[in-house]
Amino acid sequence: MKTLLYAGSLKLVEKSGVGQAIYHQQQALESVGIPVTMDPKEDFDAVHINTIFPNSFLMSKRCRRKGKKIVYYAHSTKEDFRNSFRGSNLLAPLFKWWIKRCYRTADILITPTDYSKKLLQDYGISKTIYALSNGIDLQNYKRSVPAGCRFREAYGFSPEDKVILSVGHYMNRKGIVDFVELAKGLPQYQFIWFGYTPPSARTADVNKAVKTQLPNLHFPGLATQEELKAAYSGSDLFLFLTHEETEGIVLLEALAMKAQTLIRDIPIYKDWFQDGINTYKAAAIEEFQNRIQEILEGKLPSTVEEGYKTVAQRDIPIIGEKLKEIYQKLELL
C-alpha cells in the first residue's frame, strides 16, 4: 500500500505548524514501513489531507469517488481561527461551517489532542475522530551550547543577558500584544519573537504592538529550523503566551530542546501540563511578570527534565506505531 500526503497549497502553510505536521507524518509513516508519495499522479491507497483550502476539499471528494481511504487532519477549529487575522472574528461562523464540510468528506479525522477532539465532537461531526499528536523528531532537536552562543552573538546578547524567546505568527491569539507589554514591564530582560504575518493581515492592536520600539524588544521575522534550534539553545526561557491551540508544535520543540518553559494556563494544557512539574503556568500579565522573574532569578526549580519526559511520549516512532494501528482499523494493512 502507499499513502499520498496531499500537498496542495503547501507554500501557504509550509512555514507554519501545519507544514511541520505534514513533514512529521511522512517521517512517522516511513518509520513503520508505510510508503509515502507527494505526487497525486502516482497510485495510492490512502490520502492524508492537512489543509482546508478549496483544492483540499476537492481532492478529498475526488479520492472518495475513486474509493481511496481519506484521513483528514483536523488542525483547524473555529476557536483557534478567532483572534488571528484581520476580520477573523467576523468570519469565524462561516469558517466553522466550511471546516465541518471539509471534515465530513473523510473516512476518519485525526486531531492533535483530546481537547481539539472534544471541540470537533461538539460541532456535531459524527466521523470517527482520533486524538494523535503531530509528533516531534527528538533526534533532530538536541540542545547545543555552540549554537546557543552563535544565536546570542548574532543578536548582540551578552552571556549575562537573560533572553526570553517566543515563536509564532503576529496575531493576538498567539499573545504577541502581551509579549510587548511584558517587555515594557521587565526592561532588565531581552525579549525576542520569531515569526511573521503580513501587515495587511494583522489586526490594529497587533500592528501597533510590533511597531513598539524598545531596546529590549526584538522582532527579527521568520527563522529557519536551524536558527530556531539555536534560539532554543541560547535563550533562558521559552514563553508561550498563546490563548488557543490544537497542540502547539513550537512548544513541543522547546520541550524537546530542554528549554525552560512558561505557558499560559488555558484549557488545552489543563491536564497535559502540571504547574511546577513539567512547565510553569500563568494567566494574567502580573502573574507572568512574577513568574518570569522567579524563574530567571533562580527562585524556582527547573522543570526541564520532566518537560522532556512529557514530549518524549510524542516522539515520531511512537506516533508512527499509533498511525499503523489506525491504518489497521481502516483495513489498509
Please provide the spans of the model-predicted regions.
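Glycosyltransferase donor-sugar binding loop
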Residues: Y6, V167, Y189-D205
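Conserved donor-binding/catalytic core segment of Leloir-type glycosyltransferases
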Residues: F157-K174, V180-K184, I192
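Conserved acidic donor-binding segment of nucleotide-sugar-dependent glycosyltransferases
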Residues: F273-E286, Q293-L300
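Nucleotide-activated donor-binding/catalytic signature segment of Leloir-type glycosyltransferases, i.e.
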Residues: A204-E226
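Short hydrophobic beta-strand element within catalytic cores of glycosyltransferases
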Residues: Q260-I263
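Membrane-proximal helix-turn-helix segments that form the acceptor-binding/catalytic region
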Residues: L91-L109
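Short alpha-helical donor nucleotide-sugar binding micro-motif in glycosyltransferases
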Residues: Y103, L222, A230-S235
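Aromatic "clamp/platform" in nucleotide-sugar-dependent glycosyltransferases that forms part
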Residues: H243
